[in-house]
Amino acid sequence: YAFEAEDALVRHNFVSGTHTLTVALFGMLRPGDKMLCVTGTPYDTIQGVIGLPGREESGSLKEFGISYEQIDLLPDGTPDYEEMERRISPEFRMIYIQRSRGYSLRPSLFVREIERIAEIAKRKAPECIVMVDNCYGEFVERIEPSDVGADMIVGSLIKNPGGGLAPIGGYVAGKKELIENCAYRLTSPGLGKEVGASLGVMQSFYQGFFMAPTVVCGALKGAVFAANIYEKL
């Protein structure tokens, strides 16, 4: 697999990154479970999924008895590793990491930072699930979070891995048993990945995924080039 994961669920049935994340969260968490987000407040669309104050949508994790806590980032926007050492414990079923800055101005995470978070999480709570919202992060570095300890990474084919060609879709990649649970959530228990028509989108998926590293590389080069120009104005 491209992300060095045991298994993956790649489907056009995922209508957005938020939908894919929702399936992953509900696939893994059960009533009474606790999740801890270690990268501050998630971006807006995920707040409704979690059921944060002011965004307590019908059907949220909170409504299903799944509790949420978070560790805020440091003033410079980087992870607070010391607070993670204090707060992470076996009571948390999931440690949630948002790799991208989302709609804020904090820096996105490097894979090496995710590796450090995963190491702390597994040391403090060996049975926890380390889940990474990998949207906008695919192919930005030579390795992915799944290479450095993340149990599950989630993203959208409309973004980096679709290469600008995939019109819809998302993916969940990680440990086999976790992916199976997500597949049961997407379709139904007992069926999982074994059902569902592709509806003619596979060509754009294959072409987009093939082109994705080149497209992302070009975007990175363009961003660096533009930044250099504007620095000199």
Q: Model-predicted segments: where are they?
A:
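Conserved PLP-enzyme active-site core in the AAT-like
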Residues: 15-217, 221, 227-230
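Metallocofactor- and cofactor-centric catalytic cores in central/energy metabolism, strongly enriched
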Residues: 1-7, 15, 138
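A short linear hydrophobic-aromatic micro-motif
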Residues: 8-9, 156
